[in-house]
Amino acid sequence: MEMPRRFNSYCPNCDEHHQLEAEKVRSGRSSGMKWDARRTKRANASIGNHGRFSKVPVGNKPTNRTDLKYRCSECGNAHLREGWRAGRLVLQE
């Protein structure tokens, strides 16, 4: 799916319509061993099913959701919106 990089839309910070620039959100840094430490503690428990699922989830969705950040040209603040499913997203100039 092709989408324009710059378009006029509503900015919730300015409370007005301005030109917004869309950019793909990069993945953030992982926060150390927090999740893994909890998982290890659950797995080493002596009672129950050791933190395992009864049926392992398998398979991937055919498409991914878009993850875009919209930056206002007037105030410079960025905001997020709910994404949609698209096979491939290309931002046009």
UniProtKB/Swiss-Prot annotation:
SUPFAM superfamilies recorded: Zn-binding ribosomal proteins
Any GO CC annotation of this UniProt entry: ribonucleoprotein complex
Cystine bridges: none
Start and end residues of each stretch annotated as Disordered: 24-62
One annotated GO molecular function: structural constituent of ribosome
Keyword Coiled coil in record: no
Function: Binds to the 23S rRNA.
Binding partners and assembly: Part of the 50S ribosomal subunit.
The protein, known as: Large ribosomal subunit protein eL42
Source organism per UniProt: Halobacterium salinarum (strain ATCC 700922 / JCM 11081 / NRC-1) (Halobacterium halobium)
